[in-house]
Swiss-Prot record:
The lineage of its organism: Bacteria, Bacillati, Cyanobacteriota, Cyanophyceae, Synechococcales. The chain crosses the membrane at residues 15-35. NCBIfam families: PRK07352.1 (NF005606). Keywords: ATP synthesis, CF(0), Hydrogen ion transport, Ion transport, Membrane, Thylakoid, Transmembrane, Transmembrane helix, Transport. This is ATP synthase subunit b. Pfam families: ATP-synt_B. One of its GO terms (molecular function) is proton-transporting ATP synthase activity, rotational mechanism. It is a single-pass membrane protein. The gene is atpF. InterPro entries: ATP_synth_b/b'su_bac/chlpt. F(1)F(0) ATP synthase produces ATP from ADP in the presence of a proton or sodium gradient. F-type ATPases consist of two structural domains, F(1) containing the extramembraneous catalytic core and F(0) containing the membrane proton channel, linked together by a central stalk and a peripheral stalk. During catalysis, ATP synthesis in the catalytic domain of F(1) is coupled via a rotary mechanism of the central stalk subunits to proton translocation. Its main location: membrane.
Length: 160
């Protein structure tokens, strides 16, 4: 074997030896680092899967709670509409009864006014008839007829 003094070939051999030695000595060190990194990645994946599972369960629970809340809201809305309809109907009944009372009061007032007007007209008619009778009576009655009328009126009053 001859000694190779070619620097390029010699460096390649030296590099192969150095790389081999580095690989041999650092294999445990780099392997440990890589193994720890692999374990950390696996742990992170497991944590992510568990968080995904928890999030999925929470989402499912939230969706069921949302559905229950929507049903409750719908029931509350329906109850509110029913209550509003009842209140509206009650208000209409009260309005009708108040209107009937007002109409009855107005009818009573109208009847009272009509009765008052009738009485007033009767009184005026009676006064007019009396005035006319008093105006015509002295010319038609002489003293003897007047005495007879007075006597018959007194007898009627005594019998009554």
């Amino acid at each position: 074997m001859t000694l190779n003094l070619n620097p390029l070939e010699t460096n390649l051999v030296n590099l192969v030896i150095v790389i081999g030695l580095l690989f041999w000595f650092l294999r445990g060190f780099l392997g440990g680092i890589l193994e720890r990194r692999r374990a950390a990645i696996l742990q992170e994946l497991q944590d992510a899967e568990s968080r995904l599972k928890t999030a999925t369960e929470n989402l499912s629970q939230a969706q069921s709670e949302l559905a229950a809340a929507q049903q409750k809201a719908e029931k509350i809305r329906a109850d509110g509409q029913a209550r509003a309809a009842g209140i509206r109907a009650e208000g209409e009944k009260r309005t009708i009864s108040v209107m009937a009372a007002i109409k009855a009061g107005a009818d009573a007032d109208a009847e009272a006014d009509a009765a008052r007007i009738k009485d007033s007209l009767r009184r005026e008619a009676a006064l007019a008839a009396i005035d006319k009778a008093l105006a015509v009576l002295p010319a038609r009655l002489d003293a003897s007829a007047q005495a007879k009328l007075i006597d018959s009126t007194i007898k009627n009053l005594e019998n009554a």
